[in-house]
Amino acid sequence: MGAMFNGLLFFPITPYRSDGEVDLAELAAHVRRGVDAGAGGVFVACGTGEFSALEPGEYAEVVRTAVEAIAGRVPVFGGAGGPVRTARRFADRAKDAGADGVLLLPPYLTEASGPGLVGYVREATREDLSAIVYNRANARFNEDSAVAVARLPQVIGFKDGAGDLDMMSRIVRAVRDEGTNPSFLFFNGMPTAEVTQRAYRAIGVPLYSSAAFAFAPRVALAYYDALERDDLATLEALERSFYHPLARLRAKGAGYAVALIKAGVELVGHSSGGVRPPLTEVTSAHRDELARILAAGLAALPEQVAAR
């Protein structure tokens, strides 16, 4: 079992119509644009896709729409999480909608021990559907619990959103040394992951999610290509002009990890429909700042990329 990812990972937004309902036609166009641009995998209805704001029927439609739009070109994963039985129902809906797997988000408003987290993963996932476990917020794994979930046949990967490089380095080593699954995958799931990806790559985490890809695919792909080529000059130019300013802007508003991406999609001429509560819209001043950051990132592209 397992889906193979080849390239940058795309986390689409969930667009809404003017009446507040999910805009499935715009979603299909959004994910097709991303795959056409070069995404190597699509994670729909996850954090950037406002999983927490979708009711189960909407979620199923979102996943099914993405699966049909992509038509097998790259793997499609849906989000799942919350209370353990609710998470399992979302996994069931993802399976029924044709997804290749789920990204398992943390349980709802509770602290848990390592064994408790392992139990959550076991009961929230399906043995016939690939799962990637998300280490963040109240779902913080250590070496022992990470090794235990890596032994579950349906768990193909581990994604870190905690940012503890010390612990993540030890988790990577522990899972690799344990050896149950040599093809087990590790992902950087930090907000604006490009800011930390050089550090994650150095400890054995080659895959990462790019929220910025949703509105700046040329910048995101140029950065990814520079990583693959060890092109330090391009990496530093894009970090200086685009990624570090974007991370600083993200820190200016609660929920901006999602709201900024939707604002960026609007900036490049596509509909997003805004965000659902409790998220709030980007201020007009911050929207202008985002436009300047995007322009600077495009201006910093290598000549051969800018000419495309």
Model-based region annotation:
Residues 137-246, 250-254:
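Catalytic alpha/beta core domains of metabolic enzymes, predominantly
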Residues 131, 155, 276:
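Glycine-rich phosphate-binding "P-loop"
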Residues 9-15, 37-38, 202-212, 216-308:
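C-terminal alpha-helical cap/extension of soluble enzyme domains
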Residues 31, 63, 91, 121, ...:
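A generic alpha-helix structural signal
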Residues 68-74, 97-98, 127-129, 151-154, ...:
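Short helix-capping segments at alpha-helix termini
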Residues 22, 29, 57, 61, ...:
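Conserved active-site and cofactor/substrate-binding residues in soluble primary-metabolism enzymes
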Residues 2-140, 146, 280:
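Active-site beta->alpha loop and helix N-cap motifs at the rims of alpha/beta catalytic domains
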